[in-house]
């Protein structure tokens, strides 16, 4: 909307239906591959993460792309006519917004993981020894008894000792819900002005 066209300049307001998916390039734990590695075998960007921008009728030359007042990059008239996938541009306002959402979701997942590890100890040790949900000194003694012989208890025992306290578990659940609420509040695309302007000096 709000389209404005001149000989060397094009501006309009753009509101996407969804945010771009920020591809994760990080390694977790002992993983040998990243999420980004899958792009070489799956056409994810073309089929599920395509935020296309295509402009035809431009004169030959280089054009600057500005989104939301931020300069994004330089493209030729031919590249713009062929179309660019803005989801690949990690410096756009919408990509930065998506990254914040991803970071909040990772924070939420880390808190959820702690709860899962607590429940793992409860169901794989405390349930078998008749101490399910006891979370008392007798349960602590049970952990100490079996921990030296179980690598998973060695990994998760300290966390269980912390999360055996109901208040800490409740805080963790509330923090997860707060993050979920914030994610849903902030994951909506906003209108952005896009400007494509021809470079006169290179």
What does each model-identified segment do?
Residues 1-202:
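Conserved catalytic region of serine esterases and O-acyltransferases that act on ester linkages
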């Amino acid at each position: 909307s709000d389209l404005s066209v001149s000989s060397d300049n094009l501006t309009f307001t753009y509101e996407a239906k969804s945010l771009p998916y920020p591809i994760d390039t990080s390694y977790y734990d002992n993983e040998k591959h990243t999420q980004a590695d899958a792009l070489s075998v799956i056409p994810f960007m073309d089929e599920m993460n395509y935020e296309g921008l295509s402009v035809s009728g431009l004169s030959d030359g280089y054009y600057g792309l500005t989104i939301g007042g931020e300069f994004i990059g330089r493209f030729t008239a031919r590249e713009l006519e062929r179309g660019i996938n803005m989801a690949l541009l990690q410096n756009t306002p919408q990509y930065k917004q998506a990254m914040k959402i991803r970071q909040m979701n990772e924070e939420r997942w880390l808190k959820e993981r702690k709860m899962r590890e607590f429940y793992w100890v409860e169901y794989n040790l405390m349930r078998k020894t008749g101490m399910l949900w006891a979370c008392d000194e007798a349960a602590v003694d049970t952990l100490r008894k079996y921990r030296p012989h179980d690598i998973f208890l060695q990994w998760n025992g300290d966390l269980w000792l912390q999360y055996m306290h109901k208040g800490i578990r409740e805080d963790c659940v509330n923090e997860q819900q707060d993050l979920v609420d914030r994610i849903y509040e902030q994951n909506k695309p906003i209108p952005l002005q896009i400007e494509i302007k021809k470079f006169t000096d290179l």
